[in-house]
């Protein structure tokens, strides 16, 4: 999470949407940068609106706008699958030795096994009540997000390539694709509604 005080802007770091690269590029411009632990770095819109936002707004005497990125849901799960396939991941969270189809099927189960328990972007970006994210951008159109930030921050932004998931095959059988679209209907609906 990054907070830009003078611009009254907060960036929520949706997991697997380039948040590490954004932090590397912009941390020096932010009044507040929370990178650790992950539960704080990846503060949800609900937690922001309930805890962080009210504090910032009381201190500043003005409201803050909230921006975030969202990745296409299947691509987002593919990034998690590849990320957890790398060396050094705890065995119960590792996806080594399984294909993407099995990972997605496991993610669709309730309860999810540890290796597939990565949450959902719709839960991250949708509050239980109250205001949503003010400016939501598609990860596959990150240049629009960068343009928005350049305009708000008044500087050129170049995002480095850091914390990139390894490559891997992310094929799905048609029945698994259909299952994913049913289980992740809220994610697909939110993603499809993004105009930016």
Question: Model-flagged regions — what are they?
Answer:
Residues 1-196:
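Membrane-interface amphipathic segments in extracytoplasmic regions
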